[in-house]
Swiss-Prot record:
The N-terminus is blocked. Residues 10-342 form the Kinesin motor domain. This is Kinesin-II 85 kDa subunit. The lineage of its organism: Eukaryota, Metazoa, Echinodermata, Eleutherozoa, Echinozoa. Residues 667-679 have a biased composition (Polar residues). The gene is KRP85. ATP binds at G97, Q98, T99, G100, T101, G102, K103, T104. Heterotrimer of a 115 kDa subunit (KAP115) and two kinesin-like subunits of 95 kDa (KRP95) and 85 kDa (KRP85). It comes from Strongylocentrotus purpuratus (Purple sea urchin). Disulfide bonds: none annotated.
Length: 699
């Protein structure tokens, strides 16, 4: 077995460009993106550049032109990752790019049409098609989960309470995980499809000027696949692979999307998390960085293993071809170009402590043992006559009685139980036909038959319950070699056919690429051989023009990077200004209602909870109304005997009946202590001044 094998893998980056939509075509926008699938290059022309400026060129592992098929995208992008997770690796596939560039279409597609399905539904058919081809002695357990990150809050899309926020935790043996995230065991691709449909109904979407169904949250669909097979040491080994498929919300500019109100707040959170993702990518590529800011957002923390950790990762950068999206397209391509240099250290997860498959196998063995032992304890006289052993003596009425202590316990099969029931029925019938028995003996024998029958029924019920438990667990395990595709069989055939066509096409492209390289080399060799000074001057001029073009391209690249840096700075400054306004508003409200000395007390006992991203107050469960509900009023005198502090007049929270505290008469007209900041003469003036201050902040 390849257990524990590992290697350094760079993050694979592919680029996909969508076609111009009807709105862009109607407004007369032109495409500024040119893609060469054979060379894997993307060229972007600046619509505002002076004449003669060359287009910017980027090279990636794979590029997909606007006419690319969904099956081709899956086979070249996701198929190697899915094959790896079946072998026990972790894998991540995520779509990155500006809003409205087709990230959700790439990841999900149109699931009602087989040829338009995206990466996530195609992976369902791929996984169960692979299981169907495995050997019979291999066992599989597949479970799925679905979550979203909305406004920096993690929510379970498959949970009952969609308002419940989940905590992100971390353990040395498990890594980063989401506490209380629900996971469902599936047996076929149709189960996965139904679960995904359920989760999509709960996902946050909204309309903007750039996308009518814009994703307002980051969604992560996770498939956990456990397999158990025999190793070289003749022992069962469990390998666990996890596949995270991430549909990111797109970066937005308020001037283009027209977002206001709640949509603007969502866009701010989305941009902040994507900015953190960009910072993580930059820090991983920059060898000088000593700190990677994974914890700055929930998204990067959940993707910690996928970026520079134990995972095989593919990033699909989605871009738009329209000229008015030039800046966003260049920014996306630059981030994607950096991500190519991220190195991951993927290894097979063999025999992890939290594997459910091993627990299920142990439980199955235990249930089988209980079923085999469930009939023990019944006397042999309850079994068929041909299997009786021990001495017998004749009782009154001719009914045989057993001598105790000489009969071994037996394991009962369903056939033996049926024979025992038949024998009891026959003895009941024989008892009814006996006319010469004493009534007392008849009742004794009847009670004995009832006892035996009740014990038999109890054994049958116990076996039924155990069998139901056993069947329920066995249904969760999938045996290799069993075809579970059902309706998805057509999809698997479509994927395999597309994969074969893709291999043939790639082989042709590779041969053509080699031929073009050879011709290019021949041309360069010919140019190097000059027959005269005039030819040499002509050749040098061509080289000079080529170098000059490269110089102009580099200058243009520097200018674009400076402009992009300026735009990012302006966006960050705008976020800072927005947060500052919210902070000043919060501080104004706090200062208006909480005296300064109590603010200092709160600050002294407050701490930051990294897991949920909130400030928490220590011992808050033992304050206020929580204590008022628990403390009886009758204990007032008893509590005063211990000299407790008089907190009855602390900031209008406690009254004569609250917490059994001693009431100290107020000084003056008001019932609250004086504060260092003083108090306005009237409440109306206080409210008016606060309202005017709030209005000034919100303007």
């Amino acid at each position: 077995m390849p257990g524990g094998s590992s290697g350094n893998d760079n993050v694979r980056v592919v680029v996909r460009c969508r076609p111009l939509n009807s709105k862009e075509t109607g407004q007369g926008f032109k495409s500024v993106v040119k893609m060469d699938e054979m060379r894997g290059t993307v060229q972007v022309t600046n619509p505002n550049a002076p004449s003669g400026e060359p287009p910017k060129s980027f090279t990636f592992d794979t590029v997909f032109a606007p006419g690319a098929k969904q099956t081709d995208v899956y086979n070249q992008t996701a198929r190697p990752i899915v094959d790896a997770i079946i072998e026990g690796y972790n894998g991540t596939i995520f779509a990155y790019g500006q809003t409205g560039t087709g990230k959700t279409f790439t990841m999900e597609g149109v699931r009602s049409q087989p040829e338009l399905r995206g990466i996530i539904p195609n992976s369902f058919a791929h996984i169960f098609g692979h299981i169907a081809k495995e050997q019979e002695n291999v066992r599989f357990l597949v479970r799925v989960s679905y979550l979203e990150i909305y406004n920096e809050e993690v929510k379970d899309l498959l949970g009952k309470d969609q308002q419940h926020r989940l905590e992100v935790k971390e353990r040395p043996d498990v890594g980063v995980y989401v506490k209380d995230l629900s996971a469902f065991v599936v047996n076929n691709a149709d189960d996965m499809d139904r679960i995904m449909t359920l989760g999509n109904k709960n996902r946050s979407v909204g309309a903007t000027n750039m996308n009518e169904s814009s994703s307002r949250s980051h969604a992560i669909f996770t498939i956990t696949l456990e397999r158990s097979d025999m190793g070289l040491d003749k022992e069962q080994h469990v390998r666990v692979g996890k596949l995270h498929m991430v549909d990111l919300a797109g970066s937005e500019r308020q001037t283009k999307t027209g977002a206001t109100g709640q949509r603007l707040k969502e866009a701010t959170k989305i941009n902040l998390s994507l900015s953190t993702l960009g910072n993580v990518i930059s820090s991983l590529v920059d060898g000088k960085s000593t700190h990677i800011p994974y914890r700055n957002s929930k998204l990067t923390r959940l993707l910690q293993d996928s970026l520079g950790g134990n995972a095989k990762t593919v990033m699909c950068a989605n871009i738009g071809p329209a000229e008015y999206n030039y800046d966003e397209t260049i920014s996306t391509l630059r981030y994607a170009n950096r991500a190519k240099n991220i190195k991951n250290k993927a290894k097979i997860n063999e025999d992890p402590k939290d594997a459910l498959l091993r627990e299920f196998q142990k439980e199955i063995e235990e249930l089988k043992k209980q079923i085999s032992e469930s009939g023990e304890g019944l006397d042999d006289d309850e079994e068929s006559g041909s299997e009786e052993s021990g001495d017998e003596e004749a009782g009154e009425g001719g009914v045989k009685k057993k001598r105790k202590g000489k009969n071994p316990k037996r394991k009962l099969s369903p056939e033996i139980m049926a024979a025992m029931q038949k024998k009891i029925d026959e003895e009941k019938k024989a008892l009814e036909e006996k006319k010469d028995m004493v009534e007392e003996d008849r009742n004794t024998v009847h009670r004995e038959l009832q006892r035996r029958e009740s014990e038999l029924h109890k054994a049958q019920d116990d076996q039924k319950i155990l069998n139901e438990k056993l069947n329920a667990i066995q249904k969760k395990l999938i045996v290799g070699g069993v075809d579970l595709l059902a309706k998805s069989e057509e999809q698997e055939q479509l994927l395999e056919q597309s994969a074969l066509e893709m291999k043939e096409r790639m082989a042709k492209q590779e041969s053509m690429r080699k031929m073009m390289e050879e011709r290019e080399q021949e041309r360069m060799d010919i140019e190097e051989k000059y027959s005269s000074l005039q030819d040499e001057a002509h050749g040098k001029t061509k080289k000079l023009k080529k170098v000059w073009t490269m110089l102009m391209q580099a200058k243009s690249e520097v200018a674009d990077m400076q402009a992009e840096h300026q735009r990012e700075m302006e966006a960050l400054l705008e976020n800072v200004r927005e947060l500052s306004r919210e902070l000043r508003l919060s501080m104004l409200i706090i200062d208006s209602f909480i005296p300064q000395e109590f603010q200092e007390m709160i600050e002294q006992y407050v701490h930051w909870n990294e897991d949920i991203g909130e400030w928490q107050l220590k011992c808050v469960a033992y304050t206020g109304n929580n204590m008022r509900k628990q403390t009886p009023v009758a204990d007032k005198d008893k509590s005063l005997a211990y000299g407790e502090a008089d907190l009855s007049n602390v900031f209008l929270t406690y009254n004569l009946e609250g917490g059994g505290m001693k009431y100290k008469p107020s000084q003056g007209k008001s019932g609250r202590p004086k504060t260092s900041s003083g108090r306005p003469k009237t409440g109306k003036k206080k409210q008016a001044s606060m309202a005017s201050s709030i209005d000034a902040l919100l303007q």
